[in-house]
Amino acid sequence: MSLQREIGTFVAAVLNYFDTAVQQAAVVGTPYLALGKPPDIFDYTGMIRISGKKKGVVYFTAPKGMLSVMLMRMQETDMSDANLRDLVGEVANTLSGNARKDFGRNFIISTPSVVTGTSTTIGHSPDTRPIVVPIDWRTYHAN
């Protein structure tokens, strides 16, 4: 599978998630390789480790305000830290699960882990290509 098609898999997963879960379209910016400069990390980050033929991490990182509005769009009234953590992990898990449909059963995904704080760094192994898919939704930006 070409790199362009691999990226397209994640772009489609992002667009589908927002269309389905919050029933409001997101806009995906131009994906880019995050070489030399780490990507922006926001208040909450959900991470899924990938093993099998592909190795790496799929993550979704977003500001608290964006996640809160997403919960409201889902008719959720609980804006607790625990629920924000659940949501960011769910998004990362859904994006990974959708990608697994394209990549096949050798795209093995872990359960989500969640970290908070903008000082978090997302590490990657030297033999992976860190690709960032910028997401704009309403007035918010995420990766």
Q: What is the role of each PLM region?
A:
Residues 1-143:
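N-terminal auxiliary interaction/assembly segments of multi-subunit proteins
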